[in-house]
């Protein structure tokens, strides 16, 4: 092919294909460690700022769906749906799934404190939940006899197991027959 024909073919190909190698006036996209930070839709670019300021994009031929971080419905990402803390239990039961299913874009539900939650929590007494992990059941019971030095001090941590079957130090189950939790020797033969 002649050089002039090759140049014409390259021009024609450049119109149909937008590969970086076909368009010498555009630099190829950066690759490797010198490339800029990855695109994050929640960070505004200069083009997004212009769109927000003037109401129209910098390029008149830009498509709404491909320009900037606004979605097809005009939402700025990430989208957060705010619900009051008083509605948290209702959300956990059923409505949260329905809210997210009916929302047109990917969203995150954030709960915020509302006044009804504060007044309700002040009126209620604190609920007694399970004991903290670092406390032994004897300490939670509050009985002096099971406290340090009391008559219940020789019992295992797991109150359901008595000295006949014993229990290992963490209450994980009975020890093998003849094994003492005090470190004594086993009288059975192996």
Curated annotation (Swiss-Prot):
Compositionally biased spans, kind Acidic residues: 111-128
Record carries keyword Nuclease: no
UniProt-listed Pfam families: Ripply
Annotated segments matching region Ripply homology domain: 77-112
Feature: compositional bias, Basic and acidic residues: 50-64
InterPro entries for this protein: Ripply_fam
Motif (WRPW motif): 39-42
Region feature Disordered, mapped onto this chain: 1-72, 110-190
Biased composition (Pro residues): 25-39
Chief place of localization: nucleus
Assembly and oligomerization: Interacts with TBX1.
Protein name: Protein ripply3
Source species of the chain: Homo sapiens
